[in-house]
A protein has these predicted regions:
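A contiguous strand-loop segment
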Residues: 1-103, 123-240, 250, 260
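Short, well-ordered beta-strand elements within core beta-sheets of diverse protein domains
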Residues: 107-114
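Substrate-recognition/cap regions that form aromatic- and gly/pro-loop-enriched pockets
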Residues: 251-296
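Catalytic-pocket segment enriched in acidic/His residues
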Residues: 244
C-alpha cells in the first residue's frame, strides 16, 4: 500500500519543503537503510536492476535508500543533490507486462541520476517508455504486480508522476500540500505527459484507473489530505512524523500488510537538507533516526 505526502510553503512553518512516506509492505518483509556512494562509470557499462539489465549512466549520485532486502530498488530515499522520491502501487486498466523495471527500481534510478525533481521526472518517464515496468513486487509472490505512481521533491518544487504501463502523466506542485495513496489522481491538468496522452487530450485517472476516480472520504488519501490541511502553515518534520503514526486514518498500517519503514525529509533552499528514517516497522512506536546521504 503506502502513503506519501509533501508540504511546501506556505504550508510549512519555516519555508522548507517537507516530504514523508510510509512504506506498507508484506509484514514479514525486512527493509533496510543503505547508503551507496556516488560513482563514475565507463561507456557501455550496464546496471543489473531487480529483473532486467539496462545501460548505466555516466555518473551516479550518492544516495541513502530504504530498501526491501530482496530487491535492487528502493521504496524511498534521498540523494546528495537534495532530491527525494517515494513510490506507490497503483492498479490500472492497462495490461501488466513481463518482468521489467519495478517502480522501486525507478525510485533508485531516479535518485542516482537526477540533480533536481524535474530532472527525476524526465529520467523516470524516459526509462519507463524504453524499458517498461513489470514483475513480481513481493518476494515469492508472482501474483503481486502493479503499476506505479511517484512523489518527487526537492527544495524548490514537487511532482506527482503517475503511470499505467508505459503511459504517464506528471503534475507540478509549487505551493501548499499534496499526498498520494495507491490511486490515480491526475485528471486533465497534467504539466507533462506521454505523447499518446497529449495527442488525445486524455483524462489520465478516468482512462486508466481500475477503481472509481471519485475520492472516498474515508480513504487514506482523503484522511492524509485532511491531516495536512489541519496543520497548514505550521507543518514541521514532527508534524509529518505524527501523521505517519496516525492509526485512525489507517496511515500507520498493522496487519498482513504493515508499515515496514518510514521516512521524513526537510529540504532547505540553503542546502541544509535533513532526513530521518525508521529502518524498522511501525512509526507509532519506532523512533525516526537522522540519516546522512554521505557519512561525515
Amino acid at each position: 500500500m503506502c502513503d506519501t505526502l509533501v508540504a511546501l510553503p506556505p504550508a510549512t512553518v519555516d519555508g522548507s519543503v517537507i516530504f514523508a512516506k510510509n512504506s506498507d509492505r508484506p509484514a514479514e518483509e525486512a527493509q533496510s537503510v543503505r547508503r551507496y556512494a556516488g560513482a563514475t562509470h565507463r561507456a557501455g557499462d550496464m546496471v543489473r536492476c531487480t529483473y532486467v539489465e539496462i545501460p548505466q549512466a555516466p555518473a551516479t549520485a550518492a544516495v541513502v535508500l530504504s530498501q526491501p532486502d530482496w530487491m535492487w530498488g528502493a521504496e524511498m530515499g534521498a540523494n546528495a543533490h537534495g532530491v527525494v522520491i517515494g513510490n506507490e502501487a497503483v492498479w490500472t486498466r492497462a495490461p501488466m507486462g513481463p518482468p521489467a523495471l519495478l517502480g522501486m527500481d525507478m525510485v533508485r534510478l531516479g535518485l542516482e541520476r537526477a540533480a533536481a525533481a524535474a530532472e527525476a521526472v524526465h529520467i523516470i518517464a524516459a526509462l519507463l517508455e524504453v524499458h517498461g515496468q513489470g514483475g513480481a513486487c513481493a518476494e515469492g509472490d508472482a501474483s503481486f504486480v502493479y503499476h506505479n505512481s511517484f512523489l518527487i521533491a526537492d527544495a524548490v518544487e514537487a511532482w506527482v508522476l503517475e503511470t499505467a504501463d508505459r503511459d504517464w502523466a506528471a503534475e507540478r506542485i509549487t505551493a501548499g500540500t499534496r499526498n498520494i495513496s495507491n490511486g490515480l489522481t491526475i485528471r486533465t491538468t497534467y504539466d507533462k505527459a506521454s505523447k499518446a496522452l497529449i495527442d488525445r487530450h486524455a483524462d489520465f485517472a478516468a482512462d486508466f484507473s481500475a477503481a472509481p476516480v471519485q475520492l472516498d472520504p474515508t480513504s487514506r488519501q482523503a484522511w492524509g489530505g485532511r491531516l495536512l490541511d489541519q496543520h497548514h502553515g505550521a507543518i514541521t518534520p514532527e508534524t509529518m512524523m505524527a501523521i505517519l503514526a496516525d492509526h485512525e486514518s489507517g496511515i500507520c498500517m498493522h496487519g498482513a500488510f504493515a508499515t515496514t519503514a518510514s521516512m521524513v525529509s526537510r529540504l532547505a533552499a540553503d542546502g541544509g537538507h535533513q532526513h530521518w528514517m525508521t529502518g524498522a516497522p511501525f512509526p507509532c512506536r519506532t523512533p525516526f533516526k537522522p540519516m546522512d546521504v554521505v557519512l561525515p
